Regions:
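Short loop-beta-helix segment that forms the pyridoxal 5′-phosphate
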Residues: 47, 59-81, 94
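N-terminal "arm"/small-domain region of PLP-dependent enzymes with the aminotransferase-like
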Residues: 1-45, 137, 171
Length: 358
């Protein structure tokens, strides 16, 4: 099983500017901070069971049915409760992808098979995936769209073909759309409109990245199969979504201008960063999200930390070796600092080697 390591360890590297965690570069909205402050008056009461008002706000924001919703203590909480509820015996996971899927599945004794994403295909899922499903016959699959750490989306035609294959084969399909808000035209990549027709589809989302509130822990999921949601709630601890998280979520959902402003910054800065990184000889992949996946010198993580920059070393992801990294897209002044440090720590031999590596 993969060692449990994530980005965002600012406590261990408290002297560093953090590019390892991928959140909205504008930071937490002031209205959300105020909602958390105001919720202090309610701390003497238990949190609202079922998150009724929050679910109504999410349903309105996502243009879906409240009955399809379940809320959790972050997306990770829902991944674990779904695994406990379904208790699958075999899963097929892309490699590389978000580590929490495997952590949750292994915790319930599930066998893991991997679909390895290849560098020569820019780490994209290929058209053979439906055939692999038929051959492997898993009980459940997890697909991250866009994928983490690569930032690549799955083509909508292929995604729908996978969904249809899963329905025909009796495979439960989980699509993690936590980073979908940061790609261009996210409505062209979501499967939300397929929920009613496909009860074996679960879509995962979170407030963490969109509103830069990883410390709050608030996620949600959609599924049209009420039995699945009931089973998840049955294996989840009571009051798993705090009063502060519920109030923060309702305030955050009103911040549409903030979300769009963050998106525009990401689109502009991502293009600028990719060009600068390529000029440094780094191998940059076509990430579509609010982070950039690239290949460089094997010692780059340590060199950057020494210069006060924390990047995500992706070598602990299955399917990746030493030299693969991920960096968040932040505000321009911060991104300039990253590029400055990357240039400082790149030896001439590194630049030459990186241009032809992988």
């Amino acid at each position: 099983m993969t060692k449990h390591i994530h980005g965002g360890d600012v406590y261990k590297y408290d002297h560093c500017l953090d590019f390892s965690a991928n959140c909205n570069p504008l930071g937490t909205p002031q209205s959300v901070k105020q909602a958390i402050i105001d919720s202090v008056e309610d701390l003497s009461d238990y949190p609202r069971v079922g998150c009724g008002p929050l679910k109504e706000a999410i349903a309105d924001y996502e243009h879906t049915k409240k009955e399809y919703l379940i809320c959790g203590n972050g997306a990770a909480d829902l991944i674990f409760s779904l695994s406990r509820a379904l208790n699958p015996k075999k899963a097929l996971l892309p490699a590389p992808t978000f580590a929490e899927y495997e952590q949750a599945l292994v915790s319930v004794g599930c066998e893991i098979s991997r679909y390895y994403l290849k560098e020569e295909n820019d780490f994209c899922i290929q058209k053979d995936y439906p055939d692999v499903l038929k051959r492997e016959k898993p009980d459940i699959i997890f697909l991250c769209n866009p994928n983490n750490p690569t930032g690549i989306t799955i083509s909508q035609d292929l995604l729908e073909e996978i969904l249809e294959t899963c329905a025909m084969q009796g495979i439960f399909m989980v699509v993690d759309e936590c980073f979908l808000d940061f790609v261009k035209d996210p409505q062209k990549h979501t499967l939300k409109e397929k929920l009613e027709k496909y009860p074996g589809l679960f879509i995962l989302k979170a407030f963490t990245k969109r509103y830069a509130i990883p410390g709050v822990r608030l996620g949600y999921g959609f599924c049209s199969d009420r039995e699945v949601l009931d089973r998840m709630e049955a294996v989840t601890q009571p009051w798993n979504v705090s009063t502060m998280a519920q109030q923060a979520g309702m305030a955050a959902l009103k911040e549409s201008e903030y979300v769009e402003a963050g998106r525009q910054i990401i689109f502009r800065e991502s293009a600028w960063m990719k060009e600068k990184m390529r000029q440094l000889g780094l191998t940059v992949y076509p990430s579509e999200a609010n982070y950039i996946f690239f290949y460089g010198p094997e010692e780059l993580f340590e060199r950057c930390v020494a210069k006060g920059i924390l990047i995500r070393d992706c070598s602990n992801y299955p399917g990746l070796k030493k030299g693969y990294y991920r960096v968040a897209v932040k505000l321009h002044e911060q991104n300039e600092k990253l590029i400055e440090v990357l240039e400082e720590v790149q030896a001439p031999s590194d630049k030459l080697r990186s241009s032809y590596s992988v």
